[in-house]
Amino acid sequence: MSDIILDSKSFQSAVSKISREISDNNKNIREVAIIGIQNKGVFLAKRILAEIAKLAGIGRSLIPFGTLDITLYRDDLDDLGSKIPVIKDTVIPFDTSRKNIILIDDVLYTGRTVRAALDVLMDFGRPKSIQLAVLIDRGFRELPIEAKYIGIRYQSEELIKVECKETDGVDRVTFIK
């Protein structure tokens, strides 16, 4: 059984809210680069990139875009036992130095995914800044990590499922009981 936290309309509203806030807080859009954390963060990042480019009145290709996989940087690899994690692509085809990196993921919970993402990102250089954007902030942090841009706050230790049109055919966030 599941309860809907965000339907398609409120999902898009949350993405638009994040996009506007990023645009408002980064007046020099030429210094911004967008990086999505695999998997769902990449799809959200592409949407946010499109909205930011539209707000700035420029083409999407003028804002650097990358994808980041944290698999090899996870702090729980030993706990996975014989389960072999699937490694996705990390593609950052631009110099991260002197860029305000907008790091995007679907859910912020313990902070461990973001910690791993920061480790990966620092291997690519020293950005001017790193700003975290998430669709859902669940609270219950285990590490001192906070998002600057949040679609919605939904404090819960229960499982949350994020579905995106690109992979699931629908935009929706549900609380799984």
From Swiss-Prot:
Name of the protein: Bifunctional protein PyrR
Encoding gene per record: pyrR
Catalysed reaction, written as an equation: UMP + diphosphate = 5-phospho-alpha-D-ribose 1-diphosphate + uracil
Keyword Transcription among record annotations: yes
Keywords, ordered alphabetically: Glycosyltransferase, Transcription, Transcription regulation, Transferase
InterPro entries the record matches: PRibTrfase_dom, PRTase-like, PyrR, PyrR_bifunctional
GO biological process assignments: regulation of DNA-templated transcription
MF term (GO), any: uracil phosphoribosyltransferase activity
